[in-house]
Every structure is written in structure tokens, then in C-alpha cells.
Amino acid sequence: MLENENGRSNLSSMLDGYQKSNNNSINLHLAKDQKLIIKRTDQVSLEPIPVKTTTTLKQGLYIVGADIKPGRYIAKQTSKDSTNNLTLYNDNYRLKTNEILTNRKMKSSKSVKPKPQTAIDIKKNDIITIYGKGTTQLEPQ
């Protein structure tokens, strides 16, 4: 479970195995005052990764300003048969965007309308989470 300074979690289902995933790793950047609580340490290994900005997003959590440069982007699902859930939060953990990105044909509902791409405006300290086994590419606009 990942908690912010208010004890609110925003990645618990991705990390606790509640939802099945074909991924065996995630990238995670802990910001100031965030805690990672690991309950089953025998099943987890932690390795530091170099911090550099990217526009290629796999499953994980990304901090704008540390992992991704602020700006306007088109977020595209680049994997042919995969689906990703892209969520964007502001620095107070308020949801700004929640999109299902896929190139597959899927049924839409009133609340879920999958699409291959979406435009996003991201600011320093915004948080992007990607859940799924595909790759999401951010193209600067």
C-alpha cells in the first residue's frame, strides 16, 4: 500500500495483488512524506532505479517534474492488443483524468469509453498512474 501524508492510499490494489496482472514489476517514485507499506516482504524485492524523465510509461506511478516534464501531451496506447488505465491526480490527490486507453475494440458504457489516445495537461507534482500490461506513450504538443 502506498500512503501520502494524510494516510490516503492510491495504489493499494495494484500493489496488493487484489487485481490480477501479468506484470511482475512496477516503477514507483516515493515523494516526500509518502510511505510504502509492505505486508508480505518474502514476496517483494526493491531495487533503486535511476531517476530520469521519460515519455514512455509502463505500469507504475510517475511524478510530474521528477519522472515526466510538465506540459501538454497526447497519451497514446502503443501496444497493439493491450489496455491501460491512465489516471492523473493533482498534487492534492484530486482526480483530474481517468481514461482507459486501448487499440482494441471494446464496448463502451455511460461511464467507460475506451479510446486509443487522450490529451492531458500535466503540472509539476501531478501524479500519473498506469495500470495494465501495455505501454502508454506521451507525445508533447
Can you annotate each of these PLM segments?
Residues 22-24, 57-71, 114-117:
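Short, solvent-exposed S/T- and G/P-enriched segments that are highly enriched in secreted/extracellular
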Residues 2-53, 80-141:
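Primarily secretory-pathway and cell-envelope proteins
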Residues 1, 62, 73-75:
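A short tyrosine-centered beta-strand micro-motif
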Residues 68-80:
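A short beta-strand element within beta-rich, extracytoplasmic domains
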